[in-house]
């Protein structure tokens, strides 16, 4: 009997998932700093070793516990989308990837699906045993299900962090053809029987005004922040928004 996956949520928003396999546990995404405590507690409760970390993408809220986990589990593997490695060093992650992933690759019971857009090498994982799709940030379920290219004031960071809004929307549409029973997103609770909600979210992103409004709005804000940063009027770097390092 297959053990169900475990959702580990920081602040109720930032998700990582422990997926039991025959040889131990696969961790999908690594949250922000402190996620290792949740991971290790769950691993002890399950009585299973952590074998690998498989990232959906390399943004700061998905890689925070990698280096700490690597010191705690010396044989741990780090799996990253082949086109999504450049951010790791910029984010201060010292651990190099063990394996680069492309669509169609297998990670235990998981099949890798290329979903570029939110980041250049974003990937999703489908567990064919139970039909769970780990979509990363192509879809966001805060405060309701939406494509990450669609801005919502309640939780705007995934949209600010989106590398290519139009490509993200196309990736979301492609996921409608995946035979899934549960959608597990990077932010917010999992959704059973998700296809109706996914279709509505994709249609909203393709509605003819919403994606354009989002793209123009985010681009305008980023441009304004960049100008203010250049003028010394704000503290910090607008680069995090421009390069899609958050969300």
Identify what each model region corresponds to.
Residues 26, 54, 78, 132-134, ...:
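Residue-level marker for buried hydrophobic side chains located in beta-strands
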Residues 33-107, 203:
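Active-site HxH/HxHxD metal-binding segment of metal-dependent hydrolases
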Residues 207-247:
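C-terminal regulatory/interaction regions
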């Amino acid at each position: 009997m297959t053990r169900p996956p475990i959702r580990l949520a920081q602040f109720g928003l930032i998700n990582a998932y422990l997926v039991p396999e025959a040889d131990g546990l696969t961790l999908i995404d690594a949250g922000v700093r402190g996620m290792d405590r949740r991971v290790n507690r769950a691993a002890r409760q399950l009585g299973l070793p952590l074998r690998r970390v498989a990232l959906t993408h390399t943004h700061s809220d998905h890689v925070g516990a990698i280096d700490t986990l690597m010191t705690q589990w010396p044989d741990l593997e780090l799996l990253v989308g082949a086109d999504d490695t450049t951010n790791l060093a910029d984010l201060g992650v010292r651990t190099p990837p063990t394996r680069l992933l492309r669509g169609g690759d297998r990670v235990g019971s998981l099949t890798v699906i290329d979903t570029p857009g939110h980041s250049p090498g974003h990937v999703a994982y489908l567990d064919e045993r139970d039909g769970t799709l780990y979509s990363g940030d192509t879809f966001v379920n805060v405060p309701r299900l939406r494509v990450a290219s669609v801005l919502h004031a309640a939780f705007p960071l995934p949209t600010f962090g989106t590398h290519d809004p139009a490509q993200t929307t196309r990736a979301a549409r492609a996921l409608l053809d995946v035979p899934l029973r549960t959608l597990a997103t990077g932010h917010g609770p999992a959704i059973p029987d998700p296809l109706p909600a996914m279709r509505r979210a994709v249609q909203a992103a393709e509605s003819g005004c919403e994606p354009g409004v989002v793209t123009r709005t985010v681009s305008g804000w980023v441009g304004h922040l960049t100008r203010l940063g250049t003028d010394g009027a704000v503290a910090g770097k607008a680069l995090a928004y421009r390069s899609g390092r958050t969300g």
